[in-house]
Amino acid sequence: MSSLSILFATSEMAPWVKTGGLGDVAAALPAALRKAGHDIRVLLPAYPALKQAFPTATTVAELPAFAPGLPASRLLAAQTGKLELLLLDCPELYDRPGNPYLDATGRDWPDNALRFGLLSRVAARLGQPDSPLSWQPDIVHANDWQTALAPAYLHYQGGAASVVTVHNIAFQGCFGREMLAALGLPEHAWRFDGVEYHDQLSFLKAGLQLASQISTVSPTYAREIQDEHFGYGLAPLLRHRSAELRGILNGVDTDLWNPATDPVLATGYAANRLAAKRTNKAALQTEMGLEVTADRPLFGVISRLTSQKGLDLLLTVAEGLPELPAQLVVLGSGDKLMEAGFVELAKRFPAQIVVKIGFDEGLAHRIEAGADCFVMPSRFEPCGLNQMYSLRYGTPPIVRATGGLADTVVDVCEDTLADKSANGFVLDGDTPHALWLTIEHVCRTWQDKKLWQRIQQNGMRRDFSWTHAANEYVALYRDAIATRA
């Protein structure tokens, strides 16, 4: 089957600009599509970090002011590996340090509508016959609200087929009606089946309404966001477009997250060499100042410390861990009261509980390798990555059956052990008591070393590479092109 030309439009891309999962996807999915033989280019703003990383990027197009509120800009071309980047250079909109969406006080930049309206407009322009480049994509792939206006421009002005991917539906990019003219959208776009949403212009709603096809980052999340509880007001629209909506589970970087070759571990290991994992446990206990012992399970957490992540449940029951007996290591930051609560616990039980506020990439890898079990009781989780890292590292996770957690973690029971799919523990409910019962179940199961090893190996043998996801996206792109035709 013929290869496709794809424009992947994003507001962030690891390792240069990342606030969440979108940054990881923007680095990994285009690379997987390129490896599969497709002609893909990634469009993103020329933030300071990108301009510093690619000082020799060349100008490939000068772009006029497309609308009253949008300044002139230019496109720079750069190369990372075999992947071509198109950097949208507009210093007055993007030459700002730090977080791409928030100022130093943590507030949204007041001109975010213009900043990401321009990004969306340029993405659409590259997919139109009058593209400033000699290259034109078959498909424009928008991601989250920051580029979700691109399908609207393509709908009203004509051009390539489009896909919009929802990474987190809670963020919708809503602005005042005055932005309609400022962004160069036609007056007739202001209607319920256009860009209007509760008397505001919503970038995400516009994309969901007008894209050729829609995706989100796991099959379960695709179902959940059609329900009022998870849809943040957009569930009726998503139910209406359910035939064009599919969930495609994110992959993980299997080179970066590989316990056999991970350079920051005390020693490498694999599914057939699990004894070496115990060395990593002892090394983690030593590094974190915990009692070095093989006789109690070590639970690990790497997370934002928020109620959305379910860490309030763990905070409520964690003081019981030393009596089980069990240990706990926590790496993360978030809600200040929750941070303080975990820090106080660590002070009370210094040999069995340790808490590090902040983030450390190397330590994250060592926790995945050294912990016996990973705790991730999120109340909602569109896809989630840490549960897949945990499975790769032979560290069975505790999760709730939501979003991508439900699509990747199979609860330990008689049937799943028999068919070799059991790889983790799914807690029944959304209460501290439910989590505690699951922790006790984990501790009992962990005592049976042969059974525990089977569970570890089941998880380690799952394929979480991006190859499968890339193939699903190609099928989605072809459906979008057929729909547009």
Curated annotation (Swiss-Prot):
Keyword terms of this UniProt record: Glycogen biosynthesis, Glycosyltransferase, Transferase
Query: What is the official name of this protein in its record?
Result: Glycogen synthase
Matching Gene3D superfamilies: Glycogen Phosphorylase B
Give the source species.
Answer: Dechloromonas aromatica (strain RCB)
Can you name one GO molecular function term for this protein?
alpha-1,4-glucan glucosyltransferase (UDP-glucose donor) activity
What disulfide bonds does the UniProt entry report for this chain?
none
So what EC number does this one have? 2.4.1.21
- Which InterPro entries does this UniProt record tie to the protein? Glyco_trans_1, GS/SS, Starch_synth_cat_dom
Q: Which residues bind ADP-alpha-D-glucose?
A: K18
Q: Does the keyword Glycosyltransferase apply?
A: yes
| Metabolic or biological pathway, per its Swiss-Prot or TrEMBL entry | Glycan biosynthesis; glycogen biosynthesis
